[in-house]
């Protein structure tokens, strides 16, 4: 469970490392956030005003319980926000942080969601943190049936062990080529 990573400061540290890159991509200086397990919750945006105590104030102090791991429900809600509610005609980079693979029954559903969204303006950058195995996410790059490759994955056992340059390079490894492919397919403008 990711509970220990919230309590020991790992997730707070990851947020602090990701915020600078998110600020470069976001138009309003805020990073939208969700917490997920079997279900999900939309959380208040992360910004320069609240990032330093975000995990404590918005997650641990609110008593969110961490259960199993299902990606598809939260991915559908993320897509709903960016494709229906906000309807911005700009590419969207999702930094999807997880501490482990999803449950078996969620894998085909997640495959379906990724395929369905492969002709939309959303790129999924999955980031595995901690000591878990990520066999499902490692196979994601070879998922067939997509209009274009709309997802990438890397794992970092300890986010403190890599430099900002290394982290940003990993985060943006496939995003520029996705932008080019999405433009050539008329998915984004």
State what each model feature region is.
Residues 7-14, 64-75, 106, 164-172:
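Phosphate/oxyanion-binding active-site loops and adjacent basic polyanion-contact surfaces
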Residues 24-25, 79-90, 114-118, 185-188:
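Surface-exposed acidic, glycine-flexible loop patches that form ligand/cofactor-binding
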Residues 32-37, 93-99, 125-128, 153-155:
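Extended hydrophobic secondary-structure segments that form protein cores and membrane-embedded regions
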Residues 46-49, 133-182:
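Von Willebrand factor A/integrin I-like adhesion domains
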